[in-house]
């Protein structure tokens, strides 16, 4: 489980007869008394300690009772508020001075608090009278609420000496079992903390300078004998409007079928993350997302680099690094498909609109604040596009590990046989599964008990709006946990329960149509011909435990087939698309498009998802099989899509690993958080949710 240090490792005396360890050491020169008690029955450190420094007079040697010779004493404490949901660390330093001539007592309290969710240097204060300096820092284990086990070291593990001439504190803590020493120097004039960790077994030095005025980087020493501790530093170079970075609205003119898009938010965002691995290397991940405000096409690019060494300039917060592996990786792809290999040109009359172009856009974004990865998939239908469109492009991203500059270039472009114009988002769905692991602290009688906390959650949202003559259907829902939904055309994105709408094929229905994933509605006149549809979903989840470390994290395969027949259409009836994408330490990606024939007259949908995940201490696999079937009273031309996507991530211990898999309307995000060396089997229930549409497009 987690390594626990008891008080007797760092103090001079231990009471072995009592049920709890009580360690007390007295320095006869300075009469400094340190006392800390720990509960030996729990695997927790005593994170609250009180150090009282008293100058005793030589005439009576009675410490506190003789106030005339006791000029100063200081009491410092550090505690975790168990009632606060934000895991606030509070450090209080009280310095009391007594004037021996006038017996005037003056007290000075310095209280600083910080949230465990951020990595900053909290406070560095120096009392010029007593020359007692208190420095409270939060280590990188508290850099994220989902980072797992938080390590809090009590002050009795550190021996502090004060140099009256330089007013600087030199603190050294030593772990006798790991032979590691940590030296922290505090410059009281500049309040700059310089921490040096020396692993005497491997002779490797790690130095991190922190500028408390900018509060950008924080660091802590790692235990070199175990793999449970590591150092993590996070740098975010670009800020973006956190409200939204997507197109806010996409109104449609029903007469001309022209889409006008407006955006009130930035159309590009960039995120860079650096994670230090336990083997001494670092992982750099860069993510850039941009949105075309005209076509609403979302492109995402990024790269992951293994850095052998990295240093941070405390003045400019610039990371300098050297890498033994390439910094160029294929990380994202955007494919544009046509529902028909050939056909007549597009008509602007929506009622006779005979050609529809589907733009499949897959995006993946990383939230720097919550350390979770989410993915989304958007299907676009062109309102004024031409036929014979078949385009697949893959982005290669170059990342400069020193400046975090990201440059993108296409790798495998396929020439387009047609052109696209303004697109209308018709389908968007996202699924996320996250887990949080941490500790909660309760304090009683100077004993802090740490309790592991484990929680998992899943959520899913989707919005679909298909605009096609004689084939109007929309499915929109937003739920949490498992669900199956087939909803009425053009419901809001917050629909919670499924419903089926049947209409007379000869009747024209005027609906308030939802275009895209926004919650606003736009009137669109549609001709309904489908009378009935039904869907069934079967979910199977299994878990496998594995002890493999540093291996491929997740592999996902998604196959989608969709067919609907049209006896009046004589051209090629199927388009098969096979795609593979690999996210590894070397570029790997293939894209193949071919045409096949089909004569199916009944629409069938089948989705098979296979997910397997392997983290540093476990692997999880889940299988979800979904079968959709529907029959229609009006059959149109045939379309068939088969999309296979394989994503593989290489991860290291203590890093947050995620995978996003997407098919035409299926998108998933899985976040696995590992910390410590605990053999944790439960990663959280993998929940798949799907919306079934009784038409050719999902």
From Swiss-Prot:
Low complexity bias: start-end ranges: 9-56, 158-183, 455-465
Triggers of expression: Induced by pheromone. Down-regulated by RIM101 and inositol.
GO cellular component: membrane
Segments for region (Disordered): 1-65, 133-183, 197-274, 455-480
Record protein name field: Pheromone-regulated protein PRM7
Protein's organism: Saccharomyces cerevisiae (strain ATCC 204508 / S288c) (Baker's yeast)
Source species taxonomy: Eukaryota, Fungi, Dikarya, Ascomycota, Saccharomycotina
Gene that encodes it: PRM7
């Amino acid at each position: 489980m987690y390594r626990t240090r008891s008080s007797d490792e760092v103090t001079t005396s231990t009471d072995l007869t009592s049920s709890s360890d009580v360690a007390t050491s007295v320095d006869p020169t300075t009469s400094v008394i340190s006392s800390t008690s720990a509960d030996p029955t729990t695997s927790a450190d005593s994170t609250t300690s009180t150090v009282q420094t008293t100058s005793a007079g030589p005439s009576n040697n009675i410490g506190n009772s003789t106030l005339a010779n006791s000029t100063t004493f200081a009491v410092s404490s550090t505690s975790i508020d168990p009632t606060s949901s934000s895991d606030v660390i509070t450090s209080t330093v009280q310095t009391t001075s007594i004037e021996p001539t006038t017996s005037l007592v003056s007290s000075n309290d310095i209280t600083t608090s910080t949230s465990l969710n951020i990595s900053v240097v909290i406070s560095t204060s120096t009392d010029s009278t007593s020359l007692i300096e208190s420095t409270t820092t939060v280590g990188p284990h508290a850099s994220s609420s989902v980072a797992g086990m938080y390590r809090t070291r009590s002050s009795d593990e550190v021996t502090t000496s004060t140099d009256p001439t330089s007013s600087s504190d030199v603190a050294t803590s030593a772990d006798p079992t790991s032979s590691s020493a940590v030296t922290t120097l505090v410059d009281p004039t500049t309040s700059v903390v310089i921490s040096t960790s020396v692993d005497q077994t491997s002779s490797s030095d790690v130095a991190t300078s922190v500028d408390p005025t900018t509060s950008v980087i924080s660091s802590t020493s790692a235990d070199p004998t175990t793999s449970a501790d590591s150092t993590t530093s996070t740098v975010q170079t670009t800020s973006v409007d956190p409200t939204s970075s997507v197109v806010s609205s996409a109104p449609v003119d029903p007469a001309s079928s022209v889409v006008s898009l407006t955006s009130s938010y930035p159309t590009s965002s960039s995120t860079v993350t650096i994670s230090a691995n336990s083997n001494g290397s670092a992982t750099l991940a860069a993510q850039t997302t941009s949105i075309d405000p005209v076509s609403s096409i979302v492109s995402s690019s990024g790269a992951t680099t293994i850095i052998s060494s990295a240093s941070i300039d405390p003045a400019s917060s610039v990371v300098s690094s050297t890498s033994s592996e390439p910094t160029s990786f294929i990380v994202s792809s955007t494919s544009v498909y046509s529902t028909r290999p050939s056909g007549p040109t597009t008509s602007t009359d929506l009622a006779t609109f005979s050609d529809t172009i589907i733009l499949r856009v897959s995006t993946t974004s990383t939230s720097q604040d919550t350390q979770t990865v989410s993915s989304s998939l958007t299907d676009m239908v062109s309102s004024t596009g031409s036929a014979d469109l078949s385009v697949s492009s893959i982005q290669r991203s170059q990342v400069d590990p020193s400046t975090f500059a990201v440059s993108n270039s296409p790798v495998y472009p396929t020439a387009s046989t047609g052109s696209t114009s303004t697109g209308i988002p018709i389908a968007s769905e996202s699924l996320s599964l996250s887990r949080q692991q941490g500790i909660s602290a309760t304090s009683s009688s100077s004993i802090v008990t740490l309790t592991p906390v484990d929680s998992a959650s899943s959520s899913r949202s989707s919005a679909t709006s298909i605009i096609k003559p004689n084939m109007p259907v929309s499915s929109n829902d937003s739920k949490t946990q498992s669900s199956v939904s087939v909803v009425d055309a053009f419901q809001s994105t917050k629909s919670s329960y499924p419903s089926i709408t049947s209409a007379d094929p000869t009747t024209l229905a005027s609906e308030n149509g939802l275009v895209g994933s926004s919650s606003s509605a736009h009137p669109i006149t549609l001709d309904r011909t489908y009378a009935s549809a039904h869907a069934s979903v079967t979910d199977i989840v299994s878990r496998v435990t594995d002890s493999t470390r540093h291996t491929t994290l997740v592999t996902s395969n998604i196959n989608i087939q969709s067919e609907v027949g049209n006896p009046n259409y004589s051209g090629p009836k199927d388009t098969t698309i096979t795609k593979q994408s690999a996210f590894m330490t070397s570029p790997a990606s293939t894209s193949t498009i071919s045409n096949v024939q089909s004569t199916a007259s009944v629409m069938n949908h089948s989705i098979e998802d296979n997910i397997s995940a392997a983290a540093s201490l476990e692997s999880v696999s889940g299988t979800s099989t979904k079968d959709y079937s529907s029959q229609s009273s009006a059959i149109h031309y045939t379309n068939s899509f088969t999309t296979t996507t394989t994503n593989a991530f290489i991860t290291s211990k203590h890093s947050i690993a995620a995978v996003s898999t997407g098919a035409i309307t299926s998108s998933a995000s899985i976040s696995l958080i590992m910390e410590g060396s605990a053999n944790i089997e439960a990663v959280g229930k993998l929940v798949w949710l799907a919306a079934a549409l009784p038409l050719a497009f999902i």
